[in-house]
């Protein structure tokens, strides 16, 4: 059995890989690991979920695991992942559990666990939980020591008050289209943006348990682009299923990705004296254009492996104030312990109003090099990445790109796929090189399918 935890919790096909039995064991193990220290008294865990159909089943399983280990379950219902992280600290809970597979299809689900204060767990703590899962349930309490279930009636309002602090000025006069991905932010995001003064047009905000992330949200911007143009909006914001991401499109429908958002926010924070150590933290996936834009204004860029958890670790280690990923995970520790798509949207709109600038004008501070990202589904990520044919294709690509571009090949931490990313001075070169390397990856093992780029464009590449 491989490691249970990936880069963003435990994920799998609900009821097949992520079974109620496994989730019950995870809940009990988390309770035993995270709720056995501190002063005597009742132990409490916050539990939330996104609206996908399997969430109700898995919520029941998590609650059974928690309460069977003597921990009270404080149920907050359908809310974004960053809401669960925030509420874990706000309620002074021992830990928090979010049931979500983020941007994944509805057939999947996942378990994310937050430690005290709403911080993501480190590898050692995850390993301890895994050991407890495989070691059995341990001694179970009885009688009054069994955990209880409590519904947190004020959870949504508490969270909305929290995110409202991200907008320091009124957004009156700004029109925004928000694509909620039929996900956890379908209610919270429009409410937060309206409370800040913006005119809000919400789309894909009618979750039925089945339609989450279905041709909408941050993984498919087609409907957002159309709505922005149709309503002549100032911008569009797209969240994923659990709203820890935010991507944007400008008034022309052009993408403003996480890299460009980070550049906009870094410049704003630098101007306000809030960019700690004049440093931005991002991952190896960020476009070279981000590095060039930051270098031109004297901002230091620190790079981590892919995954917001690694960005968070670097932010905490260096006491930095801004970090994120190209995919739209943006983290500002002063405003939350993890990435929050709604807060990102509010800060972006605040900058537009402060400077009386269009989003396109703000985003022009960064000139992105042509980048092609191809996701190749494979049966075995490790074997495919290490295959001689693939390594040869990568080496050939590196020679062709020279010092005017780069190639990055990495297994996904949350899905059965390998990501092929190529940047080059010319778009046709990037496409040609990426397609050739992706074909080599696809030829390994039992190839399933290939598409480009992280579903943002929705354009499939036939290899």
UniProtKB/Swiss-Prot annotation:
Q: Does the keyword Membrane apply?
A: no
Q: Which InterPro entries match?
A: A-D-PHexomutase_a/b/a-I, A-D-PHexomutase_a/b/a-I/II/III, A-D-PHexomutase_a/b/a-II, A-D-PHexomutase_a/b/a-III, A-D-PHexomutase_C, A-D-PHexomutase_C_sf, A-D-PHexomutase_CS, Alpha-D-phosphohexomutase_SF
Give the free-text PTM comment from the record: Activated by phosphorylation.
Stated EC number for the protein is: 5.4.2.10
Reaction equations catalysed: alpha-D-glucosamine 1-phosphate = D-glucosamine 6-phosphate
The cofactors required by this protein are: Mg(2+)
Report which superkingdom the organism of origin falls in. Bacteria
NCBIfam families in the record = glmM
* Name used for this protein in its record: Phosphoglucosamine mutase
């Amino acid at each position: 059995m491989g490691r249970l935890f990936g880069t963003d919790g435990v994920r799998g096909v609900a009821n097949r890989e992520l079974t109620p039995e496994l989730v019950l064991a995870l809940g009990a193990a988390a309770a035993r690991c995270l709720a056995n220290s501190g002063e005597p008294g009742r132990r409490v865990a916050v539990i939330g979920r996104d609206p996908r159909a399997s969430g109700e089943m898995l919520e029941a399983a998590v609650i059974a695991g928690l309460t069977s280990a003597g921990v009270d379950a404080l149920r907050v219902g359908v809310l974004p992942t960053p809401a669960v992280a925030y509420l874990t600290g706000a309620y002074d809970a021992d830990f928090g559990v979010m049931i979500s597979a983020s941007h994944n299809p509805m057939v999947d689900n996942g378990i994310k666990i937050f430690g005290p204060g709403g911080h993501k767990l480190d590898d050692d703590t995850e390993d301890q939980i895994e050991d407890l899962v495989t070691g059995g349930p341990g001694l179970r309490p009885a009688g009054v020591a069994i955990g209880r279930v409590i519904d947190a009636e004020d959870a949504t309002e508490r969270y909305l008050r929290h995110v409202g602090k991200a907008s320091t000025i009124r957004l009156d006069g700004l029109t925004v289209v928000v694509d909620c991905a039929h996900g956890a932010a379908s209610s919270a995001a429009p409410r937060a943006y309206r409370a800040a003064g913006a005119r809000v047009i919400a789309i894909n905000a009618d979750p039925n348990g089945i339609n989450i992330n279905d041709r909408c949200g941050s993984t498919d911007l087609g409907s957002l682009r159309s709505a922005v143009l149709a309503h002549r909006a100032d911008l569009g914001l797209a969240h994923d299923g659990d709203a820890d991401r935010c991507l944007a499109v400008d008034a022309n429908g052009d993408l403003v990705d996480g890299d460009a958002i980070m550049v906009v926010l870094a410049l704003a924070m630098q101007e306000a004296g809030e960019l700690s150590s004049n440093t931005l933290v991002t991952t190896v996936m960020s476009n070279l254009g981000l590095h060039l834009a930051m270098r031109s204004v004297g901002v230091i860029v620190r790079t981590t492996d892919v995954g917001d958890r690694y960005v968070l670790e670097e932010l905490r280690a260096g006491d930095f104030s801004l970090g994120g990923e190209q995919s739209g995970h943006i983290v500002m520790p002063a405003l939350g312990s993890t990435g929050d798509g709604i807060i990102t949207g509010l800060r972006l709109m605040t900058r537009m109003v402060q400077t009386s600038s269009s989003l396109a004008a703000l985003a022009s501070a960064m000139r992105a090099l042509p980048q092609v990202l191809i996701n190749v589904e494979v049966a075995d990520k490790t074997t495919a990445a290490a295959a001689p044919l693939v390594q040869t294709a990568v080496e050939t690509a590196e020679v062709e790109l020279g010092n005017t571009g780069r190639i990055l090949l990495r297994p996904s931490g949350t899905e059965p796929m390998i990501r092929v990313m190529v940047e080059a001075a010319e778009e046709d070169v990037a496409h040609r090189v990426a397609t050739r390397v992706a074909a080599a990856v696809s030829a390994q093992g039992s190839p399933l399918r290939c598409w480009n780029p992280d579903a943002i464009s929705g354009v499939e590449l036939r290899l």
